[in-house]
Amino acid sequence: AHSYGGVVLHDVINNTHAHKAIEKGADGLIAVAAGAGGHAGAKSPFALIAEIRQWFDGPVALSGAIATGQGVLAALAMGADFAYIGSAFIATDEARATPEYKDAIVAGNSDDIVLSNLFTGVHGNYLAPSIKAAGLDPANLPVSDPSAMNFGGDAKKAWKDIWGCGQGIGSVSKVQTTGEFVAQLKSQFEQAKAALV
């Protein structure tokens, strides 16, 4: 990315990884905190941002259960330069997710999110309905041995229909266009900011 003038932001789940990412040449960081969809961190967003900001003043995004304008404002208040929203955008018309995936997000809440390392060998957050649809019990998933995982990319991904998702989905009430969702975020952000002053 640097060769064409691009900016590199590196996902990190803790302060150690943040240091390594900057040492290796990343321009900024995406602090992936607890509650994020897919491969999530376990750190509180408060702790993660505070630790990073003690030594790094470059661009930092915060990710993890952010699905509202209020969440964006909170991320900025904690010291992030911007918020990174993922799961809520899956439930937009433009997303290439299946209708079932989008509907599960709209119908779900944080209780429907399961943390497991079974599917990739790395802990991540997934939607319980997709785990059930695969014939597994979300409450009794075995622990994976990361050393036995095939990361070569040759085999078909058996977990392709296991849907990564963050804990912020309880704030997603409908499938809408990206433009409508962004307008909603802006309105919520402005209302939340005005309420603080």
For each of these PLM feature ranges, what is it?
Residues 1-13, 55-63, 67:
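Short beta-strand/loop segments at the ligand-binding rim of alpha/beta enzyme cores
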Residues 10-12, 30-31, 62, 83-85:
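General beta-strand structural signal in soluble alpha/beta enzymes
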Residues 11-50, 92, 96-98:
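Glycine/Thr-rich beta-alpha phosphate-binding loop at enzyme active sites
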Residues 9, 36-40, 63, 89, ...:
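Conserved short-loop catalytic and cofactor-binding motifs
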Residues 4-5, 24-25, 56, 78-79:
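Short, structured coil segments at secondary-structure junctions
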Residues 2-5, 29, 177:
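Short low-polarity hydrophobic stretches
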Residues 45-61, 67-197:
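Conserved active-site-proximal phosphate/metal-binding subdomains
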